[in-house]
């Protein structure tokens, strides 16, 4: 199964939130960039060979909409 995550460029750091849709990961990346004043966040693709991703699209988008 494929999922998307937000990561930090030139760093092993990433946010452990699995997104089913790349568009939702981009919304989260844009939020983090504005919040932190950083431009080095990007989207990575993760492929689960064993197990399933724990998709958090709805939960994260709901939290972001409440924080605006």
Which positions does each model-derived feature cover?
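Short, mixed-charge low-complexity intrinsically disordered segments
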Residues: 14, 31-68
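Conserved aromatic
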Residues: 18-22
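Short amphipathic alpha-helices within nucleic acid-binding modules
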Residues: 25-28
């Amino acid at each position: 199964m494929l999922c998307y995550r937000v990561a930090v460029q030139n760093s092993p750091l990433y946010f452990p939130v699995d997104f089913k849709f790349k568009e939702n990961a981009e919304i989260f990346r844009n939020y983090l960039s504005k919040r932190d004043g950083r431009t080095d966040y990007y989207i990575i693709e993760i492929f689960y060979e064993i197990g399933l991703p724990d998709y958090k699209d709805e939960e994260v988008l709901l939290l972001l909409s409440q924080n605006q």
